[in-house]
Amino acid sequence: MSLRPLPLLVVPGLLQLLFCDSEEVIHNTESVDWEDRTVPETLVGNLFHSRITSPLRLFVKQPPDPKPSYADNTKNFWDWLANITEIQEQLARTKRRPIVKTGKFKKMFGWGDFHSNIKTVKLNLLITGKIVDHGNGTFSVYFRHNSTGLGNVSVSLVPPSKVVEFEISPQSTLETKESKSFNCHIEYEKTDRAKKTALCNFDPSKICYQEQTQSHVSWLCSKPFKVICIHIIFYSVDYKLVQKVCPDYNYHSETPYLSFG
């Protein structure tokens, strides 16, 4: 028995009927309203767009923002730094200096502000100081001095037993009972130096270089304490000064201490 290949009969009308039936099945199962679009209407395109309406809207890439310039970055940095610095200073003042509205913390010592001005041929010195009572048993003393010319300046807090002298003697180094109970220490210190040109004092026709120094010192004191004094040491080419200033026991006085040398 021999097998013979059967001929394949192709009926064009039948294939067209099958193709149309399959397309109708897809439309009926999806039940999606079609929209007008520029995509070629093919079977694959119909299948893709029937599931996602306007798919290009979901993947639209926004245009990139213009890159900020160097000046904009610098301005933003300084604005941020100024805001951060202002916030930190406010927090520091809030922690260290609580608001006290009662009158009993108004005056703790006989003076509040300190001012000293020293002028010589070689140096011009201005020292200012201020006491701030925190109301919680502690207080701060802030010093600032500006000098123009040549010289060394030292401003500090000492107990009343501190000896006023130019040279340090062996007796002055001995600690007394009062100095041991002196609970004050430096909390902050900063010094800035610069040079400028000006007319010479000895010869106005010439130009001399002058050194400018600005210092900020902050002291913090706590109990127990009785009396504190400001100790100033100043050395220059033509002038020497050692001065101790103590507060007045008449704490009702509102007049600040003024010293001119």
Swiss-Prot record:
Residues 176-261 are annotated as: V (Cys-rich). It comes from Mus musculus. The lineage of its organism: Eukaryota, Metazoa, Chordata, Craniata, Vertebrata. Residues 88-166 are annotated as: III. One of its GO terms (cellular component) is extracellular region. This is Neurexophilin-2. Residues 23-87 are annotated as: II. GO terms for molecular function: signaling receptor binding. The keyword Secreted applies. Glycans are attached at residues 83, 136, 146, 152. Belongs to the neurexophilin family. Its main location: secreted. It comes from the Eukaryota. The keyword Secreted applies. Rodents express at detectable levels only neurexophilins-1, -3, and -4. Residues 167-175 are annotated as: IV (linker domain). It is found in: Secreted. InterPro entries: Nxph, NXPH/NXPE. May be signaling molecules that resemble neuropeptides and that act by binding to alpha-neurexins and possibly other receptors. Keywords: Glycoprotein, Secreted, Signal. May be proteolytically processed at the boundary between the N-terminal non-conserved and the central conserved domain in neuron-like cells. Coiled coil: none annotated.
